[in-house]
Amino acid sequence: AANAVWNYSLVEGQRAFLVFNPLFDNYYGYDVGIKPERIYPFLTKSVEELTDENEEEFADHPAYLENMWIAGGYLNVIFNQKLPTTHKHRVSLVKKAGEPDIADDGYIHLEYRYNTYGDTLDVFNPSVGVVCYNLNTLPLEEAKGIKLKINEAYYGERILSFENMNEPTPDDAKELHSIARLEVE
């Protein structure tokens, strides 16, 4: 049977949303055999180092964050953004240079950064985006969890705590099959 997944190349470590139809139970030793229908690759990035020299590049503009959770060694973020008019926007997960991997409180301290590159957010026609950050460079097993500093458009600056490093996928994240392709890097 044909499927709609054509001209897609797998990329090691890239996260994606797969829409499929189950075909068979207990298929050659697997739980189920499937027919892929669509695949939506997500922007997949690593944790970056924040220094005095590159702080302006990461910026810290308010972001429209919808949901965040950690699973499979990734911090997964669902966000809304205005479609860029001139430059791709930049979303980043950063760790301050020179700080220990695990702080005195037992947590890994990170920051979510957003750079609009001067685009205004006054005319807001939101589009949903997803970014997944690979956390494999961090000592997750040795830490109590992650404390994440965010700058939300609705609530301002906050710190979120994540103790569960393998959360179930939120229900709203299971409905991303209509996601638009955003211009972010």
Name the predicted role of every residue range:
Residues N21-Y30, L140, I150-L160:
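Short acidic/polar inter-strand loop motif in beta-rich domains
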Residues A63-D119:
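Short helix-loop boundary/capping segments
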Residues N7-G33:
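Flexible glycine-rich surface loops and low-complexity tracts that mediate binding to linear polymers
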Residues N26-N80:
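Surface-exposed beta-loop interaction hotspot
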Residues Y154-V184:
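Short beta-strand elements
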Residues A2-W6:
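N-terminal post-signal-peptidase region of extra-cytosolic proteins
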Residues S9-Q14, N115-I146, A153:
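Short, solvent-exposed, Trp/other aromatic-anchored flexible loops in extracytoplasmic proteins
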